[in-house]
Amino acid sequence: MAEHPPLLDTTQILSSDISLLSAPIVSADGTQQVILVQVNPGEAFTIRREDGQFQCITGPAQVPMMSPNGSVPPIYVPPGYAPQVIEDNGVRRVVVVPQAPEFHPGSHTVLHRSPHPPLPGFIPVPTMMPPPPRHMYSPVTGAGDMTTQYMPQYQSSQVYGDVDAHSTHGRSNFRDERSSKTYERLQKKLKDRQGTQKDKMSSPPSSPQKCPSPINEHNGLIKGQIAGGINTGSAKIKSGKGKGGTQVDTEIEEKDEETKAFEALLSNIVKPVASDIQARTVVLTWSPPSSLINGETDESSVPELYGYEVLISSTGKDGKYKSVYVGEETNITLNDLKPAMDYHAKVQAEYNSIKGTPSEAEIFTTLSCEPDIPNPPRIANRTKNSLTLQWKAPSDNGSKIQNFVLEWDEGKGNGEFCQCYMGSQKQFKITKLSPAMGCKFRLSARNDYGTSGFSEEVLYYTSGCAPSMPASPVLTKAGITWLSLQWSKPSGTPSDEGISYILEMEEETSGYGFKPKYDGEDLAYTVKNLRRSTKYKFKVIAYNSEGKSNPSEVVEFTTCPDKPGIPVKPSVKGKIHSHSFKITWDPPKDNGGATINKYVVEMAEGSNGNKWEMIYSGATREHLCDRLNPGCFYRLRVYCISDGGQSAVSESLLVQTPAVPPGPCLPPRLQGRPKAKEIQLRWGPPLVDGGSPISCYSVEMSPIEKDEPREVYQGSEVECTVSSLLPGKTYSFRLRAANKMGFGPFSEKCDITTAPGPPDQCKPPQVTCRSATCAQVNWEVPLSNGTDVTEYRLEWGGVEGSMQICYCGPGLSYEIKGLSPATTYYCRVQALSVVGAGPFSEVVACVTPPSVPGIVTCLQEISDDEIENPHYSPSTCLAISWEKPCDHGSEILAYSIDFGDKQSLTVGKVTSYIINNLQPDTTYRIRIQALNSLGAGPFSHMIKLKTKPLPPDPPRLECVAFSHQNLKLKWGEGTPKTLSTDSIQYHLQMEDKNGRFVSLYRGPCHTYKVQRLNESTSYKFCIQACNEAGEGPLSQEYIFTTPKSVPAALKAPKIEKVNDHICEITWECLQPMKGDPVIYSLQVMLGKDSEFKQIYKGPDSSFRYSSLQLNCEYRFRVCAIRQCQDSLGHQDLVGPYSTTVLFISQRTEPPASTNRDTVESTRTRRALSDEQCAAVILVLFAFFSILIAFIIQYFVIK
């Protein structure tokens, strides 16, 4: 077994901060039981074996331990943790959780340094012993064999007892049948592997990067799990790390059976095979894990690709293993190995963060080679004529070193070496050398495999004579009580020669001469405990084994002076003035050993001011403080500066300057707008109050043309109102302030003008018409009333009450352009100043001279529909219209129409004209101008018009059907068949009430039905034909007359039974129709007769029918008859009959009211039945109409 690191002192670990958790677990029969102690990756567990030796087990590992008395050793609880008992499936566990929510494991480092005392009360199973760890930890400690040195610490710890394995409720630990069988099969496979591979469980720790172990170590804290064996409970100590810090997982998670089975598969891996073994390299090859365990195939799916981790150890089979490879390859080459070294290599399989148990260790030994390069030889002794060198043997790399080869350059320094010794000894003496001679040496080693490389070259000197006189020491830095000195080696001294130095010092006032202050090999020394500002003499002596040198030349250095003491408090010298005073002060009692170079005076304003400013710096001890403010407090202090530094400040002197009258104020300012007779002034305090508060103000006023000031206000307020002033007048004001010392000077004058009045009314302006479109307006300056006129406003317009501003400015004239000729215009002018606007002048009217007419606008063609001239023909005529232009003051006499002929056409004062005698289908360019007595106006814009071809003749119009509201007209009969193929459009017109013909129809059809006409009314119609050539002439007027209308249908009559043989029939009454009387015809049909018989005809709206028979059905209906009287004679127009009403005559039963009600209800029910019948017919008709329309839309149109 390889050497283990010695155990540290365990007393460093066991402190009172770690509480003790005792977890005894006793089985039911009280016999011995196996306890599994789980060790986390990177942690260690120290135990005592049967032979009495200690062993540290590194994680991850589970150490089975046998408890002779059925109890678990005490468990140390980290500071800030507390145990908690939880129950899971009938098993109680003790879990260590943090006491505070903000527990941070970084504050607990007590377990980093040394392991706990060993556990003597438990015997570990030999097959579960891992190699010694890097860090040794012990989560459990025996309580029975604890030595007395730990007892005081344990007395202050809290001990928590574990609970029984079975709960008090009688619940037992259970698994379902499938999980139980899988667990037993895995346990059997694990035991079989332990039987064939004795040292399987003592494998080194795997890589802690992705270890699935539930035990972690954070900042040195131990989190372990103690799982009980068969029929035992378990205790678990665990803490995790969350987002914000360390969190403790109080839940106990168990791996599912599939994960356990997969771990067993990953553990079934054979050891690697070493090949191509060299001195410093080796090739390792291995195979993936086998899916067969003891002849059985694992039920879990076998992955195609594994991850592997290779672990090697050079300290024995149970030594410390380290990870050298992590990847998916099955062979690697290890480099940087040590020659002739025994190595143990293991491989561990991994898949999806699940790791198996490492394989068995493959043992291989690297080959031997030449020795390593030795270290340079070191000098053991030197004289004037010899050097004795020694060296240490390097690593022999598996073969014993036979000879050492020592080479030197013979003191020549040319870089050429020769052998001076070869042998097995480790020292050699070189003789016959010269004093102070320098030689270079190098060393190599030789064994059976070859010679190593040479070591680094070293230079050594032989001893010489006594040292020469060194140079004088140099001052590097001086202090108040110390001096730092430095010196150098004497010239010609070998670099490796050991020389010592003696530093001697003499104080000039002591009289004792030079005394040694330092004796050693250093080249610098600081002499302390000196006096300030004092001169000291120094010299240095060098010596070696041969003797002492002569002393160096004496040098003299002076210590620094100390800072001076605090100066005396300054005092006032002479009288204190308002703006200055003089102060003086005395020097400090202690000047610090140096002359005072200067004094600095600082001053702060205010009795408690802390803002100090330097006002003086110099050697004199008095100063004049000037440029001060009257009536203010000032604090003064002084400090001094010498070569030793700056002293502290003295006590402060408080001085107050006397007050003076205040300084001048700023001129008063106007507040608000000035009024005509008063102004309001406001001012502020003076910038300088003279050191005393302002008590009052005085305001004086004088007219600007006279310098006769008079006081208008005196008081403490900062504003006043001055009244009784003249408007538009300028006044001068000045101000002064007063305090307890009197009035100060006046301020500068401030000129303020009272509010002026608006300007006076301007005189009527003068208007001069320069042309028909331009006029010049002039006006004069009115009285300004205290202010200058800034601008004038000229209003101009064609209506006296509606004028607009056409000019606004300082000028006295304005030219208005763009006027209309022969037009009356009105104008007025107004003056404005900064105060306001004066009244307008009187209104002046002017008339511009007349001119030629304006340009004719809106020249356009008149459409054929708008022309009422019967002689108009679009083929030979063109109708134009225009708007009358402005006559510009002279009446328009005529218009001149230019349409392309050599001579223009002149027409009278009209706005439309028909140009006749033109050529059909010809384009003409037409323009027009107006003429008056002054001449012709400009031509209008030109338009292009074209005459139409000759149109067809109108057809003959006739009435083919008529009613009292409709007339159906037809045309086109008798037309030649050749025209039937032409695309002729027809335009039907009818005369309205005003005697004008309006359009009724325009289209290709030959019939048209005129609707919504009045009865017995004559209407005039005319028609014209149109084709591509244009519209033909209108036909002659045709007159058609509508007949009179018949009365409307009446509602169903109402029947009321009078007695068994008489009933009364009533119906609605109609008004006379246009003066024609209306009579009624009542018909009845008895029983099953097929014809109605008239029983009444007359103007009444009711009739009593007295021929009723019992138990018979009667049907009644009525119609209205219009009696007309015209030129043809008397004529009756019979309207449609009403709805038939059924009446059944029955014998009247007493009481009479009951029978009447029965007849009434019967009549009503019959009437309602007929109405319902009509409604049903109407609904059915609407439904069929919609259905037919849908069919036509879907099958015909689409």
Curated annotation (Swiss-Prot):
Report the residues modified as Phosphoserine. Answer: 203, 207, 213
GO molecular-function terms, A-Z: RNA binding
Would the keyword Transmembrane helix turn up in this protein's UniProt record?
Answer: yes
Q: How does it sit in the membrane?
A: Single-pass membrane protein
SUPFAM superfamilies (alphabetical): Fibronectin type III
- Where does the sequence pass through the membrane? 1177-1197
Compartments reported by the entry: Golgi apparatus membrane
Tissue specificity is:
Expressed in the odontoblast and nerves in the dental pulp. Also expressed in trachea and to a lesser extent in the brain, liver, lung and kidney.
Give residue spans, biased composition: Low complexity. Answer: 202-214
Q: Which residues carry this modification: N6-acetyllysine?
A: 384
Q: Which CDD domains match?
A: FN3 (cd00063)
The protein, known as: Fibronectin type-III domain-containing protein 3A
* Name of the gene this protein is made from: FNDC3A
